[in-house]
């Protein structure tokens, strides 16, 4: 979906990697949460504390999923799922955006 309705949005951004990755938390009436983020070109490693679905909103990412050795490409409109308590890497050569839904 390209529009989120009836939500509350955190004014303060979540800033990572010296400002190269930034996101905002979005809270829904049912108690669920998503983050909307922008990633500058680079390579980054993230860890999860709960399950996540990462949807690519614009651009593309190469992703090294947990327990794999091959980078996989995800472009606009695609998504990948992550378990809780894992680490994964992403890299991109141009600005890209994502929406993270928490499971």
UniProtKB/Swiss-Prot annotation:
Return the SUPFAM superfamilies for the record: RmlC-like cupins (SSF51182)
Please state the Enzyme Commission number of this protein.
2.4.2.1, 2.4.2.2
Question: Does this UniProt record's set of keywords contain Transferase?
Answer: yes
Fetch the Gene3D superfamilies from UniProt.
Jelly Rolls
Q: Which residues form the signal peptide?
A: none
Q: Which Pfam families match?
A: Ppnp
Alphabetically ordered keywords of this record: Glycosyltransferase, Transferase
Give the record's GO CC terms. Answer: cytosol
Annotated GO MF terms: guanosine phosphorylase activity; purine-nucleoside phosphorylase activity; thymidine phosphorylase activity; uridine phosphorylase activity
Alphabetized InterPro entries for the sequence: Ppnp (IPR009664), RmlC-like_jellyroll (IPR014710), RmlC_Cupin_sf (IPR011051)
Tell me what reaction this enzyme catalyses.
a purine D-ribonucleoside + phosphate = a purine nucleobase + alpha-D-ribose 1-phosphate; adenosine + phosphate = alpha-D-ribose 1-phosphate + adenine; cytidine + phosphate = cytosine + alpha-D-ribose 1-phosphate; guanosine + phosphate = alpha-D-ribose 1-phosphate + guanine
Q: What does this protein do?
A: Catalyzes the phosphorolysis of diverse nucleosides, yielding D-ribose 1-phosphate and the respective free bases. Can use uridine, adenosine, guanosine, cytidine, thymidine, inosine and xanthosine as substrates. Also catalyzes the reverse reactions.
* Protein family according to the UniProt entry: Belongs to the nucleoside phosphorylase PpnP family.
Q: What is this protein called?
A: Pyrimidine/purine nucleoside phosphorylase
Q: Which organism encodes this protein?
A: Shewanella baltica (strain OS195)
* Gene responsible for this protein: ppnP
């Amino acid at each position: 979906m390209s529009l989120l309705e009836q939500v509350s949005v955190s004014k303060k951004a979540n800033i990572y990697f010296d400002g190269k990755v930034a996101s905002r938390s979005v809270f829904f009436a049912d108690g669920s949460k998503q983050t909307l983020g922008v990633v500058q070109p680079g390579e980054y490693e993230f860890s999860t504390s709960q399950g996540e679905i990462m949807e690519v909103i614009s651009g593309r990412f190469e992703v090294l999923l947990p327990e794999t050795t091959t980078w996989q490409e995800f472009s606009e409109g695609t998504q990948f799922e992550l378990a809780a308590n894992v680490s994964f890497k992403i890299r991109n050569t141009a600005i890209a955006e994502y929406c993270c839904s928490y499971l």
